[in-house]
Amino acid sequence: MATEHILLVCWPAVGHARPMLDYAAAQLKQNPGLIITFICSKMQIALLEGLAISEHLADKKFGDRLRLLGTGRPAQEVLKEFGDREDAKNAANSASKAPNTTANGPEPEVILTMQAATLIQKRFAEIFPTILANDDLFDEQDNSLLLPACVAGKPTTIVVNWMLPGMVETVRKHSSDLKMVTFFDNSCTFVTRMLGPRSIGGFGGIERLWSQYCNSNPEVDPNDSTLKEKLLGRRWTGKFYIPGSRMGAIEEQEMAALAKDWLLSVPLTPSLIEIQKLVDASHTILINTHLAVEERELDYLRMVYPFKKIGILGPAMFSGFVEKGEKLAAKLLDKHINVKPAASRPLTPPETPPPGSPDTDSHGEEEDPKQKSVKQVEKFLAESATGSVVYISFGTMFRPQPTHLIKMLEIIIYEMSLSSQFRLLFTFGGSKDLASSCPPSFAPQISALESQLFKSGNTLFVNWVDQHYVLQHPSVGWFLSHGGWNSCQESMLAGTPLLILPFFGDQLFNAYFLESIQIAYRFNTAANMSVADFVASFREGITCTRPESERGSQLTKNAKELQLRLKGERALAEVRLF
């Protein structure tokens, strides 16, 4: 018998929606009497339902206990607008005599995400009274039933993603006793966002937190600058230091490239005031991390927020990731498939079409693209030596600048010329190929480099991979990532070291942090960085993948040791509350 009803309201981006959905699945597994209503954009729900990582949606294992409510426009309509915006952007760049490869304006994905967030905020304010009263929710246009009344009754708790503004006002307008919970990505980002100056993408909250600390500890002298610096860090020209974190000082010049002034001015960008309202109203702060990764940062948060419960979600999440790793290990053992030694790997091209070719099977019939990708990847990895594959994925929203991408591919081609064991698995994140995601003026050069890599026989380009499978395959030695926290956590759980090329916001915080715990190499991304400086940084990082690299060997060793600690923590399989 269902006895409790919880609302989860999420920011409309896969990087935020997926961990909240994983959290929902973990809670549903542990509590048979729980029902969860998950609210996000229609677009993100459609994406989650189509991703292999969301088995709890694909096979509906929780039935009516996991209720999905999408807001905003249908997925196909959003995808069409995305395509139109991409075409317009590329046309503008093509018409320009000097294409702007470092545009200050937001990418189409960011614009559409902000639009979807606006609709979530607006729609939630409209439907919350109905959900709170536990009445049936009907569509305003055709009067169809969108969400039936919950058999467990009205919600007792609402879990809100930290990015969504205006939620406290809506909830408290209709309920004074509904328990509120804030969902955050990781404690390092939480601290940096709340304390860091705006110039590095933070919200400048040092003074407010100091006032709160003094009010909570009357014996403290508000003018004690030494204690203030010790607890909250200090700002000096060019750097920002976070106490309690191994991350040390963030270079302000580098962060400026990612802080994006246009983003800070977008109406839906959460301000410090909005986040602080949510934190103040919340009974608990849930953080998607592991104690083995962020123990110092979590201790610091406990000190800054002594009256809040801090929940660590990592051990209770990523169940699908771990299950796939176990199945992969069993499959390799059962079929007596040993990853081939370096000398026995074939040097012939994989049996996949070059970029842009149609997907057909042996009879000339079209094959499902996702299934075709799965087969290609499995074959490619099976033919690869242990640790020889560098896997590259920048997620669904980000791409390197075209000039940087060209240099990246040239350096990778050079590395392949030095060693026949260097192999590359590159996923486009939904694009048809690399060239199609760049301004037309760069497409010929990028397409030529793609073809050169393909002809080497050591490269596989696909527009989709099962990342859970790939990261845990013994052939994969390195993960070149944009530094999204979900990808970072998956890489840590797989014991795979990272090469991080951050593009935006929290990604650089993550890159700095994982570099500080010595499981990642962070490529430099300073503001107005010259192509020559980027080349130097990328070349230094990619040499870590060489078997003889001492630095690379140490990063790999550290990643494997961290994986063992995470496995021990995961054995608890519970949300830990401080």
From Swiss-Prot:
One Gene Ontology MF term: UDP-glycosyltransferase activity
Pfam families given in the database record: UDPGT
Transmembrane stretches, start-end: none
SUPFAM superfamilies with a match to the protein in the record: UDP-Glycosyltransferase/glycogen phosphorylase
Domain of life where this protein originates: Eukaryota
Compositionally biased intervals (Pro residues): 347-357
The family this protein is said to belong to: Belongs to the UDP-glycosyltransferase family.
PANTHER family named among the record's database cross-references: GLYCOSYLTRANSFERASE (PTHR48047:SF215)
Protein name per the record: Glycosyltransferase ugt1
Organism expressing this protein natively: Mycosarcoma maydis
